[in-house]
Amino acid sequence: MAIYFILYTLLTIIFAVSLSLFLSVINARKSRKRAVGFFHPYTNDGGGGERVLWCAVKAIQEENPDLDCVIFTGDHDSSSDSLARRAVDRFGVHLQSPPKVIHLNKRKWIEESTYPHFTMIGQSLGSVYLAWEALRMFTPLYFLDTSGYAFTYPLARIFGCKVVCYTHYPTISLDMISRVRQRNSMYNNDASIAKSNWLSTCKLVYYRAFSWMYGMVGSCTHLAMVNSSWTKSHIEVLWRIPERITRVYPPCDTSGLQAFPLERSSDPPKIISVAQFRPEKAHMLQLEAFSLALEKLDADVPRPKLQFVGSCRNNSDEERLQKLKDRAVELKVDGDVQFYKNAMYRELVELLGNAVAGLHGMIDEHFGISVVEYMAAGAIPIAHNSAGPKMDIVLEEDGQKTGFLAETVEEYAEAILEIVKMNETERLKMAESARKRAARFSEQRFCEDFKTAIRPIFTGPLK
């Protein structure tokens, strides 16, 4: 008798919870607001993704002024006015009006530190919980994900939203699966796993299962904008909705940077590296390459300075930055290396305008906004020979070379030496071609392509 009572109680609870959830969704669908909800939990990361957010807000305000723009963020110190100011101060983007802000309390569910193991699936499922919180508080007509949380798309559709995403890179890529299969150690494939046949097999099964789920949820979007040829090729295979996928190059500050003269001071020549202090950005490789270049430098060639410019998101990034500083001391190049943490936009622009070269070290960087910024400013890029930089950016312009591609410490060092040793005429010619190439990725071009992509969705009927 007792077991029946327990079973009845459990079924009653399940029914009550299900009914409550169902009614919440129904009420939310009925109360949808004429607004675009930007799902961007981190509005202070300072990277290219945040620039896309503010340029997208600006584009929608220009294209659809009758729609409110609402930011779903986990940054509780952010307000409408402070975010509008940040868009100007950090990225030079002027919004027509400050966006509305919805503060989220469950952001810990998408933080990497919450999931020491099975991080991808943990963060992905956590994003669903966070999106549930967001959509219950405010349900917009249009749900626009600018942070790559594809697992939120089915939920947003259940809430009656048109789903649009701007995908910087796939959460899982065919390259990641290939590396696990080949047992290559990397920042996202621990050496202990790569060395073990059993663990590699288990991880391969996990990755394949996740890629199937990722494909299912990704296919729920009404429109997917991707930022590069590399990302487009992967998303088309994973999501299998090629007719709903379009490439929109990300916004780069080319207009302001192109105002700088191409001439540079060679006392000393400055080499810049702009990237968040994240493990995949390969700052250590750049430092090692710079040190090697100095060792090989002829006595009659000006000794360059290396400037690291980036933001720190958390304690892990802070520790990574400190290790970089310590390594500079070990290599005895600390006097030749400068660090700029969380630099404001104006300072970043000034540094770019004085650099002769720019370093980029990330393997399979989906696009590479920093590379475009180097080129626009007149700094010759030295980028990793993969993905976005290789396929879209560091290509010849009118038959003229626009920069260098490298993979190893030695290749980066050789490229640094070649630029430092260049005569002024040769350097100016390459810098001019690089700047011309960068014009293809302007903020204005992004806004035009973004508006063209969303127009059929925003003018079509809501289902």
From Swiss-Prot:
Residues 1-6 are lumenal. One of its GO terms (cellular component) is endoplasmic reticulum membrane. It is an enzyme of class 2 (transferase). It catalyses: an alpha-D-Man-(1->3)-[alpha-D-Man-(1->6)]-beta-D-Man-(1->4)-beta-D-GlcNAc-(1->4)-alpha-D-GlcNAc-diphospho-di-trans,poly-cis-dolichol + 2 GDP-alpha-D-mannose = an alpha-D-Man-(1->2)-alpha-D-Man-(1->2)-alpha-D-Man-(1->3)-[alpha-D-Man-(1->6)]-beta-D-Man-(1->4)-beta-D-GlcNAc-(1->4)-alpha-D-GlcNAc-diphospho-di-trans,poly-cis-dolichol + 2 GDP + 2 H(+). Its EC number is 2.4.1.131. It is a single-pass membrane protein. Disruption phenotype: Lethality. This is GDP-Man:Man(3)GlcNAc(2)-PP-Dol alpha-1,2-mannosyltransferase. It comes from Arabidopsis thaliana.
